């Protein structure tokens, strides 16, 4: 590992890369590894995930097909197209199986934030995962990949299930404690009954691990105890 966050351009140069792959355009910014054009001049190829590419607009909904496009393109770049197609076929089958186990319930995807919760909106990886799992996004009317809302709106929409994104800087256990202690949220059925599904952060950004997010969501809902929404 070169750095806990983005390495500096100098640090990456020391590694003598042939190719630089990034999930987000910010990796090639001033606080990242530098401009892509500079790497091209050095003979180093670069690639940004289609979900993070600046040419893409997140007013257009991200779809599982976009993730498969990324797998296909990277497999072609490295000359392993057959392996890419096998991986895509495997993911397609796993997603279809997962979707067959889920119940279509109204889900709030809580990424983080306590004053103004950041939730899965219309067009990013959270909505893509929810759609693939066959559930309804309670905040699909918000624009962008993630959107800020209010706890009053959450109460009004009364999600049947709440996804808790588990990150080292904002763990799911901490989110549960917050919900249970909130003066109004604690009375929501989903909070009182702990109708939660915990999904690791690594599965919630667009990429090869999204299949794990779809499986975790579908299986988590299917495993909710008797009396849970159906």
Residue ranges and their predicted role:
Residues 9-22, 151-167:
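Proline-aspartate-enriched helix->loop->beta-strand connector
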Residues 1-28, 138:
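A short, structured surface patch at a secondary-structure boundary
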Residues 2, 23-27, 56-61, 72-82, ...:
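Second-shell loop/turn segments in exported
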Residues 26-34, 44-73, 104-127, 172-173:
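Extracytoplasmic ligand-binding site segments that recognize negatively charged/polar headgroups
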Residues 4, 22, 49, 140, ...:
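Short beta-strand and adjacent tight-turn residues that come in two discontinuous sequence segments
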Residues 77-133:
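Basic- and aromatic-lined ligand-binding clefts that recognize polyanionic substrates
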Residues 10-14, 33, 37, 65-72, ...:
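Solvent-exposed, polar/charged alpha-helical surfaces in well-ordered, non-transmembrane soluble domains
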Residues 61-70, 161-230:
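Structured C-terminal subdomain patch of bacterial secreted/periplasmic proteins
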